Amino acid sequence: MSFLDFIQNATSSSSCDMAIDLGTANTLVAITGQGIVINEPSVVAIERSTHRVLAVGHEAKNMINHTPDTFSAEHPLHDGVIADYDVTEAMISAFINKAAPRRYPWQPKPRIVVCIPCGATSVEKRAVFEATIQAGARQAYLIEEPMAAAMGADLPVTEPTGSMVVDIGGGTTEVAVISLGGIVTSSSLRLAGNRLDEAIAVHLRDLLGIKIGERTAEVIKIKIGSILPFEDGRERDMIISGQDVLTEQPKEVTIQSEDVRDALQAPIDEMVVHIKETFKKTNPDLASDIISNGILLTGGGGLLAGLDRYLSQQLEIPVWTSETALTNVVSGCLKVLETPTALKQILMRSK
């Protein structure tokens, strides 16, 4: 192989564009032609003595678990937006390099599509854009999460029909009505999976006198959490460990799924009110489409047992949970990159 051939091969092989679902709890990265290559926690390990970024994602979580006194865990995104710019930039850069390392300095940087909450301010949008460019993007595009989720779930977003999406992530619940390649009306509620975890922890502290951490609360939600009785008619229970509220000594208790349901009632009902308010802003023709086609429930929070049935009862509209709820957003971002017409029609509109 000649040196020219070597340069051409190296350049072409590295010219890959990326989609990033920059979430409060997890970050997913997908590459054109490859699909999803990274799905890791949105956490960064910072050395306490020097304040240096040492690791991100799974590696950061493992370091902190093994040597908690030496490192601190930073979650650079809160409620779906950047809380610490420098740490976010470092995290994005690390994930970009891990997904597609640049082996030669002349290799082109990737174009990157990043999702943002539909309620993000212009300052918050600018922060995501700048962080992505500084982290190594040749060009950066922003797309609102509900639009990306709808595309990832193969909803007819460019057609003259109304589609409604409820995307429950770690930090925000995004609600949007989509038609003709644009978001007709939308809203963003900074209440989502993390707040459900907090509600569980607070309720168990008050009910059983036990203090638990956020990881334990999340496990409880996933294993025995529900907002309606389980369809098989059987309730669940689970043994958990924590600290006694009064003595701070180790404590182990058995909790019931009914206890978790009580904890989740108030925040879920707040979501219902939010969805109803967004639907009220929809024009009659699109509202008719939504009533006929149903509402897409997506995001990790959308997987809570019984949530689709509960929303359907409260809204009096069919609600269905996507089979790919965890990956719809990043898949939709990737679809935009792989479809030139979508890149022009949807991304340019969202500038």
Task: Please identify what each model-predicted range represents.
Residues 1-168, 176-295, 302-351:
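Nucleotide/phosphate-binding catalytic cleft detector across ATP-hydrolyzing
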